[in-house]
């Protein structure tokens, strides 16, 4: 998955956050048990993320407009709570199993950059 900030993302306007190493199978099971959730539960509330981040490494990714972030969507992630202003971003999902184009050569010329 990727995301591009369309305006500056600061600590106060909901920057992207992720819990480091939360995508491993062992950590996912441990997190589910600690939160009394049935595994695999892929949805976490802001309260859940706050609890998780107290014992793990919550990473906040601030950046200027145009910043591109690539990340594994199986990581526990969110937009931080808004304290002021707004944060705009475009997200993109990629699924290699259902990818329409298998290689760059098959993309029509009018769609290339």
Where do the PLM segments sit?
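Short, surface-exposed, charge-dense and proline/glycine-enriched linear segments
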Residues: 1-8, 43-53, 105-113
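Non-heme Fe(II)/2-oxoglutarate
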Residues: 34, 68-70, 74-113
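Double-stranded beta-helix
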Residues: 11-75
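Short, conserved beta-strand element in jelly-roll/cupin
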Residues: 1-11, 62-65, 70, 93-97
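Compositionally biased, intrinsically disordered low-complexity regions enriched in proline and serine
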Residues: 6, 40, 45, 89, ...
């Amino acid at each position: 998955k990727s995301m591009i900030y369309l305006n500056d993302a600061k600590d106060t306007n909901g920057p992207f956050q992720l819990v480091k190493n939360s995508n491993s199978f062992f950590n996912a099971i441990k997190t589910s048990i600690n939160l009394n959730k049935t595994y695999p539960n892929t949805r976490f509330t802001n309260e859940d993320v706050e609890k998780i981040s107290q014992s793990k490494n919550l990473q906040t990714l601030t950046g200027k407009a145009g910043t591109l972030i690539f990340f594994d969507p199986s990581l526990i992630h969110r937009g931080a709570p808004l304290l002021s202003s707004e944060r705009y971003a475009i997200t993109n999902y990629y699924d290699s199993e259902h990818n329409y184009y298998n290689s760059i050569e098959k993309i029509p010329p009018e769609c290339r950059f």
